[in-house]
Protein backbone atom coordinates (compact mmCIF):
# COMPACT_ATOMS: atom_id res chain seq x y z
CA UNK A 1 0.00 0.00 0.00
CA UNK A 2 1.36 3.41 -0.99
CA UNK A 3 1.88 6.03 1.69
CA UNK A 4 0.29 9.49 1.67
CA UNK A 5 3.64 11.00 0.68
CA UNK A 6 4.15 8.54 -2.19
CA UNK A 7 0.68 9.37 -3.54
CA UNK A 8 1.48 13.09 -3.29
CA UNK A 9 4.76 12.53 -5.18
CA UNK A 10 2.90 10.59 -7.87
CA UNK A 11 0.58 13.56 -8.44
CA UNK A 12 3.42 16.07 -8.44
CA UNK A 13 5.24 14.11 -11.15
CA UNK A 14 2.35 15.09 -13.46
CA UNK A 15 3.06 18.84 -13.18
CA UNK A 16 5.00 19.84 -16.33
CA UNK A 17 7.82 22.36 -16.62
CA UNK A 18 6.58 25.92 -16.73
CA UNK A 19 3.55 25.13 -14.56
CA UNK A 20 3.02 25.16 -10.79
CA UNK A 21 0.55 23.65 -8.38
CA UNK A 22 -0.30 24.23 -4.74
CA UNK A 23 -0.29 22.21 -1.56
CA UNK A 24 -4.08 22.59 -1.60
CA UNK A 25 -4.42 21.28 -5.18
CA UNK A 26 -2.33 18.22 -4.38
CA UNK A 27 -4.44 17.56 -1.29
CA UNK A 28 -7.61 17.91 -3.38
CA UNK A 29 -6.18 15.48 -5.91
CA UNK A 30 -5.69 13.04 -3.05
CA UNK A 31 -9.27 13.55 -1.85
CA UNK A 32 -8.29 15.22 1.42
CA UNK A 33 -7.82 18.62 3.05
CA UNK A 34 -4.43 17.69 4.51
CA UNK A 35 -2.57 20.66 2.99
CA UNK A 36 0.01 20.67 5.76
CA UNK A 37 0.56 16.97 5.29
CA UNK A 38 1.36 17.68 1.65
CA UNK A 39 3.80 20.36 2.79
CA UNK A 40 5.52 17.90 5.10
CA UNK A 41 5.74 15.33 2.31
CA UNK A 42 7.33 17.91 -0.01
CA UNK A 43 9.79 18.92 2.72
CA UNK A 44 10.92 15.28 3.00
CA UNK A 45 10.91 14.54 -0.75
CA UNK A 46 13.77 12.07 -1.35
CA UNK A 47 13.14 11.91 -5.10
CA UNK A 48 14.03 15.41 -6.28
CA UNK A 49 14.34 16.50 -9.00
CA UNK A 50 12.32 13.58 -10.43
CA UNK A 51 9.53 14.74 -8.12
CA UNK A 52 9.74 18.49 -8.82
CA UNK A 53 8.83 19.90 -5.41
CA UNK A 54 10.01 23.36 -6.49
CA UNK A 55 6.78 23.55 -8.56
CA UNK A 56 4.61 23.56 -5.43
CA UNK A 57 3.67 27.05 -4.25
CA UNK A 58 1.21 28.65 -1.84
CA UNK A 59 -2.42 29.14 -2.91
CA UNK A 60 -1.76 32.89 -3.07
CA UNK A 61 0.82 32.38 -5.83
CA UNK A 62 3.68 33.19 -3.45
CA UNK A 63 6.65 30.87 -3.17
CA UNK A 64 5.69 29.19 0.10
CA UNK A 65 8.45 26.98 1.46
CA UNK A 66 11.33 25.11 -0.11
CA UNK A 67 13.57 22.48 1.45
CA UNK A 68 11.97 23.21 4.81
CA UNK A 69 12.70 26.95 4.65
CA UNK A 70 10.44 29.94 3.95
CA UNK A 71 13.15 32.51 3.28
CA UNK A 72 16.80 32.94 2.38
CA UNK A 73 18.89 30.98 -0.07
CA UNK A 74 16.37 28.12 -0.33
CA UNK A 75 13.66 30.43 -1.69
CA UNK A 76 16.18 32.13 -3.99
CA UNK A 77 17.03 28.65 -5.35
CA UNK A 78 13.33 27.84 -5.86
CA UNK A 79 12.79 31.11 -7.73
CA UNK A 80 15.80 30.42 -9.97
CA UNK A 81 14.56 26.91 -10.75
CA UNK A 82 11.08 28.16 -11.67
CA UNK A 83 12.45 31.02 -13.78
CA UNK A 84 14.67 28.54 -15.64
CA UNK A 85 11.46 26.72 -16.60
CA UNK A 86 9.91 29.94 -17.92
CA UNK A 87 7.78 30.86 -14.90
CA UNK A 88 7.49 34.65 -14.53
CA UNK A 89 8.03 35.84 -10.97
CA UNK A 90 7.93 39.30 -9.42
CA UNK A 91 9.41 39.41 -5.92
CA UNK A 92 8.22 36.14 -4.45
CA UNK A 93 4.94 35.92 -6.38
CA UNK A 94 4.13 34.29 -9.71
CA UNK A 95 2.90 36.89 -12.20
CA UNK A 96 0.42 34.80 -14.21
CA UNK A 97 -0.43 32.39 -11.41
CA UNK A 98 -3.99 31.47 -12.45
CA UNK A 99 -2.88 30.81 -16.04
CA UNK A 100 -0.10 28.38 -15.15
CA UNK A 101 -1.75 26.73 -12.13
CA UNK A 102 -1.94 22.97 -12.69
CA UNK A 103 -5.08 21.42 -11.21
CA UNK A 104 -5.73 17.73 -10.64
Predicted regions and their residues:
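Nucleic acid-binding interface residues in structured DNA/RNA-binding domains
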Residues: 1-104
Amino acid sequence: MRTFAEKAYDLLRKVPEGRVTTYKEIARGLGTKAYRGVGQAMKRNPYAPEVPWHRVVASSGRMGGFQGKTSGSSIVKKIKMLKAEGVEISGDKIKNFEEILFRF
